[in-house]
Amino acid sequence: AAIAAPASLVVVAAIRPPLGLWPSVTAMTADFHTGTGERLQIAPLPQLKIELDTQSSLRRRSDAQGEGFELVQGQAAIETGAGLRLALFAGPGCVIADEGAVRLDVRNTHGQVRVTCLQGSARIEHPQGRLQLQAGQQTQYDERLSGVVAEAVASEVSAWTEGMLVFRRAPLREVVDEINRYRRGKVLLGESALARAPVSGRFRIDDPDAALEQLRLTMSLDLRRFPGGIAVLG
């Protein structure tokens, strides 16, 4: 006889899918959603263009001064026209763009939010304070607002909008995590010691398996493949 899974386990699997093998209920019920390997361009308001990257979810969310949006998860490239006030919630903070034409790249993954201002200016409102960003600046926050602002390389930050991933001495763990966002199944690192190995390169997001093969060759790694899209690199 078949054994039914406890209801509590089913609920947990729906909210937090094991190995991230399928979207969560929260992501699937958002107003706009992309699956693995998909991208979506939308214009939900006049003078507002948004491009969602793979595994991204966006929903409408009102704020005190009007309509806004929430980046539930994933990454979005945003372009606003002059005269539009945009409130984009991401994690515990909110990105406000209300000072003319603005281009932003906002990423919300693994509990960490990264905001890059590519054109114009924007400010972050967070329970721990406010932070202003100008064109070419980037910051990150989670439950803490560090206030650290760094210079951003626009061509690298927005490379995904042109179908590429660009890394410059990024830890292998970070590269694998990014490949997993574009690939069905799951890539695992076989040795924890490899996690910090630096990686530099350009990879096409529409062929993540070619990226794995490139890593295997350039770093002299083993690559084992298993059913269900599971692969072990190490």
Explain the meaning of each model-derived region:
Residues A1-L71, A77-G234:
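A residue-level detector for the "anchor" residue at the start of short, highly conserved motifs
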